[in-house]
Each structure stands twice: as structure tokens, then as C-alpha cells.
Amino acid sequence: MMQTVAVIDYGMGNLHSVAKALEHVGAGRVLVSSDAAVIREADRVVFPGVGAIRDCMAEIRRLGFDALVREVSQDRPFLGICVGMQALLERSEENDGVDCIGLFPGQVRFFGKDLHEAGEHLKVPHMGWNQVSQAVEHPLWHEIPDQARFYFVHSYYIEAGNPRQVVGHGHYGVDFAAALAEGSRFAVQFHPEKSHTHGLQLLQNFVAWDGRW
């Protein structure tokens, strides 16, 4: 039977490019949906996001999706992307501080306006290709080399509260969590749908993953 992948639509995300990338890797039925019943019935769920975290969390709470995300991420493969990843943390310092869903301990921090590396001033947002160092083996890293490059666009980074949940490290002036995992949940700061070969491989791995780790 064909599996169903739900891409959660709460009005804040690069939804159709994510959906197209999932279709490209053979995800089966890909449904971009804001219907809680459709999302609950899906075999696996993707939670993308772009924009300001305050706006994202306001919509998530208005739709009741904070509880929905907690529910559906417990018992099936679940992938958070970019701001969708940041929303899974406890709190973001963006917009004078915003409480988030709290599935992963930790904070979302601003890179700052005075970010330097080896004497060079770094522009914020962090935009472009950067390496991800794999901290541990995980099914979603299958056939992706360590230090592979992925595409990032973000002004805020994740300071993880539990180092054991960090499965991928990034560096841009400061070290940050590029990927987090716990049980059937996996979340990435980068955009796999924009990351060419390695990004598509990660999505293909997600589609094949049974949610165990």
C-alpha cells in the first residue's frame, strides 16, 4: 500500500518545494495539509518553516498544531526543517523571546551583528553552503558522507540542551546544532530540499526510515 507523507501547512514554509523534493525521491502520496485529521492519518510527517518565529508560533498555537506536533512526532517518522526545527526547541530569543513547542531542550540564539571568524566579519543571516559534521551514525545519514555540504539560510542558531541529541554539528562563527534526533524525531537547520544530492539523499532516507533509532 502506498504510504502517505503529510507536510504540515500552517502558512509559514517553503511547502511546495519540500513536497516536490519528497515526490522526487519516491515518497508516495505527499499531502500539503492544514487538516489535523489528514496529518494524524499520515505514515510520516514533515514540519517545515521559514520567517519570524513569533509569527510561526502564533499560527501553530492558533491552529492547535503545538499539541498535534507533540502527538504525531511520538509514533512515526517526523522531520523538522529550518524554523520548523527551531519551533521544536523550548525557547527562541528572536522577537524579544518566544516560547516554542519544547520537544527538544535548548534555546534558539541570535548569531549577532558582530560575528567573526579568523579576523573576518561574517554576514548574518548565515546564507549558503556549509559543512555538517555527523556526530553519530543515524539512518538519515545513510550514504551521506561526513562533512557533506548543505544549504543554510538562518539568522538564529540552536544551542542544544542535551548534547546527546545533537547528531549533526555546524559552524559559522560559533558552533551550533545542525541536526537533532530523539526517537522518531529528526530535525535539521538546513534545507534538504535546496541541498541537491545530499539533501535529496536525506529525504530519501527519511522516506525509507522506520522511525527507530
UniProtKB/Swiss-Prot annotation:
Gene Ontology biological process: L-histidine biosynthetic process
GO cellular component: cytoplasm
Pathway: Amino-acid biosynthesis; L-histidine biosynthesis; L-histidine from 5-phospho-alpha-D-ribose 1-diphosphate: step 5/9
E.C. number(s) listed in UniProt: 4.3.2.10, 3.5.1.2
Subcellular location: Cytoplasm
Active site: 82 (nucleophile), 191, 193
One term of GO molecular function: glutaminase activity
Domain (Glutamine amidotransferase type-1): residue spans on this chain: 4-213
Keywords: Amino-acid biosynthesis, Cytoplasm, Glutamine amidotransferase, Histidine biosynthesis, Hydrolase, Lyase
Catalysed reactions, as listed in the record: 5-[(5-phospho-1-deoxy-D-ribulos-1-ylimino)methylamino]-1-(5-phospho-beta-D-ribosyl)imidazole-4-carboxamide + L-glutamine = D-erythro-1-(imidazol-4-yl)glycerol 3-phosphate + 5-amino-1-(5-phospho-beta-D-ribosyl)imidazole-4-carboxamide + L-glutamate + H(+); L-glutamine + H2O = L-glutamate + NH4(+)
Presence of the UniProt keyword Acyltransferase in the record: no
PROSITE patterns assigned: GATASE_TYPE_1
Domain of life, per lineage: Bacteria
Any Pfam family: GATase
NCBIfam families per record: IMP_synth_hisH
Function text: IGPS catalyzes the conversion of PRFAR and glutamine to IGP, AICAR and glutamate. The HisH subunit provides the glutamine amidotransferase activity that produces the ammonia necessary to HisF for the synthesis of IGP and AICAR.
Subunit structure: Heterodimer of HisH and HisF.
HAMAP family per UniProt: HisH
Official protein name in the record: Imidazole glycerol phosphate synthase subunit HisH 1
Species name: Pseudomonas aeruginosa (strain ATCC 15692 / DSM 22644 / CIP 104116 / JCM 14847 / LMG 12228 / 1C / PRS 101 / PAO1)
